[in-house]
């Protein structure tokens, strides 16, 4: 630690000296010393749980990796097998009433649901008989993909949950139907869905501006992804806690087409020269749904995992639960597909061809119109571009670096088949633009593989059945775990950036997103200093970074408080905007 402090002080002194003496001399400041991930020590092992023969321990992140240092990629929790002489005292299973049937799993269903042709017990034990009568006529199909995946979870830090908490194969003896306009057949609605409406909406937008540097683009993308919590631009796209289930990890080849992968690629474009960026986003909405407000049917495995959570709070296992099911579930959602294209443009070619921003935007959009009078997603129309866009879209000159306007296209696709996403990328790589036929091929596959494209979140602890033993303790623990999870992976554990750079945390690594006037891992260098005729250095307010909040004080006079401090390490004269102290009623 002494060596690191000395390096920081030396770097600070060097920054001041060069800033005062070297302005306009083309001197380039070195990047700040690398900061490696620092974990806290492991807490002592818990006692051995006699019901699972498992003991657990946890640790925390103290400092995230930064300035090309090692990122924090490990897990907070740890567990191992153990042996104990203590007895497992599980509460007795719930006794079903005379009007109920007990499934082999121990759950209870209404007796009228027995032998109706539906698996109202997830284990199918209610159908060990000849169906007396089927709930739905044979013309009605099973539930569609929108119904099967309804309610899928959301992680407020960005990771995709590994499991769905709902049992959407439960119908409660009802035969609610909806006509699917894509198949023209009737689909059956699960009990958990209160309303499902099919409504085709198509939209396509191009960024209002061409981004001059990758940081401006990245900053905009991250702000769009962030959910409004007190976490700043903090993201954790990779789940790092071991799953509570052996069957939760589903490796999907389409992951390479996720927006998270695109964000990672953009964040690594720090040294690219003479390039600018433009975004084109498209969305095809097929349906909207609303979950029931009460009596939601959760999966047996979800209940089993809730029951296995220790009554005494231990953050590692609770984090694992949140990464399995999400910090929230989807109360209301929209299903369909969306794509995002980031065009890497060659500035030299744009200037040589005298192209305007407006022309580039119009030519790189697909040009989709929606025929809302029809019910098919295949009836899109394309604006005729004729040959006026050849100087923008053609890649026939792309064999030689720098001749084409479009150097590269980064693709993010959500919804639809993997094959259609591959075709889309191949078309973009070959011609630099996507046409209406490629779009239609992708759109046709969305009905069979829809994605959640918009959601209204509700805390996951709201799904815990209140009739299970220890429900209130586990609900309180999950509330604390959600707050701790956001605080654990937070930019407050990063060091500040120079010259007004914006801090972001991506998968255990802090990055400084510089304004278009500055560069370097810490935004320490003014680009104008390297020009043949040095530009005047602008006046910049140096900003520190708030530390993490302290723990809440004890409740006194119906109030409690917490504090934080302004971290200015490595940035002289920096200040923080905001309050040092906060209070709330208790």
Swiss-Prot record:
It holds the Pfam family MACPF. The chain crosses the membrane at residues 229-236, 357-364, 365-373. Residues 132-493 form the MACPF domain. Residues 1-26 form the signal peptide. Its main location: secreted. Keywords: Complement alternate pathway, Complement pathway, Cytolysis, Disulfide bond, EGF-like domain, Glycoprotein, Immunity, Innate immunity, Membrane, Membrane attack complex, Repeat, Secreted, Signal, Target cell membrane, Target membrane, Transmembrane, Transmembrane beta strand. Disulfide bonds join 37-72, 48-82, 51-88, 96-108, 103-121, 115-129, 136-175, 363-389, 494-510, 497-512, 514-523. Glycans are attached at residues 246, 274, 354, 545. It comes from the Eukaryota. Residues 36-89, 543-585 form the TSP type-1 domain. It is a multi-pass membrane protein. GO terms for cellular component: extracellular space; membrane attack complex; other organism cell membrane; plasma membrane. It is found in: Secreted; Target cell membrane. Residues 494-524 form the EGF-like domain. Residues 94-131 form the LDL-receptor class A domain. GO terms for biological process: cell killing; complement activation, alternative pathway; complement activation, classical pathway; killing of cells of another organism; protein homooligomerization. Homooligomer; about 20 C9 chains oligomerize to give rise to a huge beta-barrel that forms a 100 Angstrom diameter pore in target membranes. Component of the membrane attack complex (MAC), composed of complement C5b, C6, C7, C8A, C8B, C8G and multiple copies of the pore-forming subunit C9. Pore-forming component of the membrane attack complex (MAC), a multiprotein complex activated by the complement cascade, which inserts into a target cell membrane and forms a pore, leading to target cell membrane rupture and cell lysis. The MAC is initiated by proteolytic cleavage of C5 into complement C5b in response to the classical, alternative, lectin and GZMK complement pathways. The complement pathways consist in a cascade of proteins that leads to phagocytosis and breakdown of pathogens and signaling that strengthens the adaptive immune system. PANTHER family: COMPLEMENT COMPONENT C6, COMPLEMENT COMPONENT C9. This is Complement component C9. It comes from Takifugu rubripes.
């Amino acid at each position: 630690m002494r060596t690191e402090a000395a390096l920081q002080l030396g770097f600070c002194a060097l920054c001041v000296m060069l800033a005062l003496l070297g302005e306009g001399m083309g001197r380039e400041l070195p990047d700040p010393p690398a900061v490696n991930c620092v974990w806290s020590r492991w807490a002592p092992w818990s006692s051995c749980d006699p019901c699972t023969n498992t003991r657990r321990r946890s640790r925390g992140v103290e400092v995230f990796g930064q300035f090309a240092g090692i990122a924090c990629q490990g897990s907070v929790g740890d567990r191992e097998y153990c042996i104990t002489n203590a007895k497992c005292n599980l509460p007795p299973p719930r006794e079903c009433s005379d009007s109920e049937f007990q499934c082999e799993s121990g759950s209870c269903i209404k007796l009228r649901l027995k032998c109706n042709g539906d698996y109202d017990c997830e284990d199918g034990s209610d159908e060990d008989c000849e169906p007396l009568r089927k709930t739905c006529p044979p013309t009605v199909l099973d539930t569609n993909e929108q119904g099967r995946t309804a309610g899928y979870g959301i992680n407020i830090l960005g990771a995709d949950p590994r499991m769905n908490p709902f049992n959407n194969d439960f119908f409660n003896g009802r035969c609610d139907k909806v006509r699917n306009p894509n198949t023209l057949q009737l689909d059956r609605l699960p009990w958990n869905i209160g309303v499902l409406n099919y409504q085709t909406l198509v939209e396509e937008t191009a960024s209002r501006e061409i981004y001059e540097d990758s940081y401006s683009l990245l900053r905009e993308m991250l702000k769009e992804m962030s959910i409004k919590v007190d976490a700043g631009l903090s993201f954790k796209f990779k789940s790092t806690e071991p799953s509570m289930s052996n069957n939760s990890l589903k490796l999907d080849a389409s992951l390479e087409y996720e927006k998270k992968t695109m964000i990672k690629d953009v964040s690594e474009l720090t040294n690219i020269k003479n390039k600018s960026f433009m975004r084109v986003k498209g969305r095809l909405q097929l349906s909207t749904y609303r979950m029931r407000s009460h009596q939601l049917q959760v999966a047996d495995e979800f209940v089993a995992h809730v029951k296995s959570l220790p009554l005494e709070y231990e953050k590692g296992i609770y984090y694992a639960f949140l990464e399995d099911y999400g910090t929230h579930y989807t109360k209301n959602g929209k299903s369909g597909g969306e794509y995002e294209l980031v065009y890497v443009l060659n500035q030299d070619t744009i200037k040589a061809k005298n192209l305007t921003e407006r022309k580039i935007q119009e030519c790189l959009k697909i040009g989709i119109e929606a025929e809302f009078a029809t019910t098919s997603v295949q009836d899109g129309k394309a604006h005729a571009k004729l040959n006026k866009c050849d100087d923008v879209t053609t890649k026939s000159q792309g064999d030689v670096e720098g001749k084409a306007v479009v150097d590269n296209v980064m693709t993010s696709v959500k919804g639809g088949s993997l094959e259609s996403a591959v075709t889309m990328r191949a078309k973009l790589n070959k011609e630099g633009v996507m046409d209406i036929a490629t779009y239609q091929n992708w759109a046709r596959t969305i009905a069979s593989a829809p994605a959640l494209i918009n959601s209204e979140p509700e805390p996951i602890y709201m799904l815990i059945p209140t009739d299970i033993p220890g429900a209130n303790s586990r609900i309180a623990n999950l509330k604390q775990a959600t707050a701790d999870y956001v605080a654990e992976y937070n930019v407050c554990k990063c060091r500040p950036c120079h010259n007004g750079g914006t801090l972001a945390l991506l998968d255990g690594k802090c990055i400084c997103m510089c304004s278009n006037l500055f560069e370097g891992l810490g935004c320490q260098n003014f680009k104008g200093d390297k020009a043949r005729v040095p530009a005047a250095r602008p006046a910049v307010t140096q900003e520190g970074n708030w530390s993490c909040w302290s723990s809440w004080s004890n409740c006194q006079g119906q109030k409690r408080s917490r504090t934080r401090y302004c971290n200015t390490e490595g940035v002289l004269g920096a200040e923080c905007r905001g309050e040092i102290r906060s209070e709330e009623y208790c």
